[in-house]
């Protein structure tokens, strides 16, 4: 297999397209702005839908709607944006809908810094919103793992979503 050299965020976006992502809803925020930038240029060419939302809150609620309609939906953000998305994430978790959320973490509390960090791991694994729910978190240690985990994330989300739909019938 031929090796390719990619920037991490662009590799994640390309992996999502190759994984069959139908739609991406996002809002630019450092350090993940390359993800929506790449998706805007390449997802429509693959037959998908890209929409830059007016806010992080709008983006996660668009994912909620798309996932509810059976689409392979994805969004991305970084720490402050993920915090803004928490209410929408609780709705998605409560409805047991499949989606992929990429968090390009950055350091510090509040708005923090623009350097990478891992402070959001606790929020992601323990639920940042109200209610009793957990989200499945895949935490890559390098770009190759990030690419592999994107495909895995879509596959797991589909399995969980289909299973929860069968349970409700």
Write out the residue ranges for each language-model feature:
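Flexible, glycine/proline-enriched loop segments at strand-loop-helix junctions
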Residues: 111, 133-145
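Phosphate/diphosphate-binding loops
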Residues: 141-142, 157, 161
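Thiamine diphosphate
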Residues: 1-127, 134, 151
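Short, structured patches in soluble enzyme cores that scaffold and shape functional sites
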Residues: 103, 139-142, 168
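A general structural signal for short secondary-structure junctions and capping/turn motifs
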Residues: 91-92, 155-159
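Residue-level detector of conserved catalytic or cofactor/ligand-binding positions
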Residues: 159-169
């Amino acid at each position: 297999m031929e090796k390719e050299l990619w920037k991490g965020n662009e590799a994640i976006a390309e992996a999502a397209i190759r994984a069959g992502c139908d739609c991406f809803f996002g809002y630019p925020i450092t350090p993940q702005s390359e993800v929506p930038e790449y998706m805007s240029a390449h997802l429509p060419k693959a037959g998908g839908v890209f929409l830059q939302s007016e806010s992080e809150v709008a983006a996660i609620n668009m994912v909620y709607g798309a996932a509810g309609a059976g689409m392979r939906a994805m969004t991305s953000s970084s720490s402050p944006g993920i915090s803004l998305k928490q209410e929408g994430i609780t709705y998605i978790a409560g409805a047991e809908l499949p989606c992929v959320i990429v968090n390009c973490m950055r350091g510090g509390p509040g708005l923090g810094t623009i350097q990478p960090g891992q402070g959001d791991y606790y929020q992601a694994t323990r639920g940042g919103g109200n209610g009793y729910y957990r989200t499945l978190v895949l935490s890559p240690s390098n770009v190759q793992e990030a690419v592999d985990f994107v495909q895995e994330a879509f596959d797991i989300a589909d399995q969980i979503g289909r299973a929860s739909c069968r349970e409700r019938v």
